[in-house]
Swiss-Prot record:
GO CC term, one of those recorded: cytosol
InterPro entries registered for this protein in UniProt: MoaE_sf, Mopterin_biosynth_MoaE
One Pfam family linked to the record: MoaE
Upper classification of the organism: Bacteria, Bacillati, Cyanobacteriota, Cyanophyceae, Synechococcales
Name the record gives this protein: Uncharacterized protein slr0903
Family, as annotated: To M.jannaschii MJ0717.
GO biological process annotation, one example: Mo-molybdopterin cofactor biosynthetic process
CDD domains: MoaE (cd00756)
Length: 145
């Protein structure tokens, strides 16, 4: 079974099959990005995060982002996965990998994919704190950036 080029997962992200799926003989560069759940934000101690996703729309838009990146940066392949549900500190919330003939294209393509995911996907993040009530945090796509 082939891996999807973009996916939303309620399970921890296993990067090894993703990296293996990106391997191709024409590629001279692999660049990956992993966004982790950190233990602080805006001076508050974060206990965990919760992501809610409009899944169908997010997947459709995610595939568009991957296609755009492949065309714009001449990538041989690109894959991205974003988590949904409740995540603990240190867990991977989002993972992006791209391959290209040269490193500059792979770096630029990876940055494009993560930037567009944060900008365009209907994903909402709620931070759970130790000493404060849980709060939904700013999402770029709600503000017409």
């Amino acid at each position: 079974m082939a891996l999807a080029l973009f996916d939303i997962s309620d399970q921890p992200i296993n990067t090894q099959p993703l990296i293996s799926a990106l391997q191709c003989d024409q590629a001279g560069a692999l660049v990956t990005f992993a966004g982790w759940v950190r233990n602080h934000n805006d001076g508050k101690q974060v206990d965990s995060l919760e992501y809610q996703v409009y899944r169908e729309l997010a997947i459709n838009e995610g595939f568009k982002i991957i296609a755009e990146a492949k065309e714009k940066y001449d990538l041989h392949q690109a894959i991205a996965v974003h988590r949904s549900g409740h995540l603990k500190i240190g867990e991977t919330a989002v993972w992006v990998g791209t391959v290209a003939s040269h490193r500059q294209a792979a770096f630029q393509g990876t940055q494009y994919v993560i930037d567009q995911i944060k900008l365009r996907l209907p994903i909402w993040k709620k931070e759970h704190y130790f000493d404060y009530p849980a709060t939904w945090v700013y999402c770029c796509h709600h503000h017409g950036s």
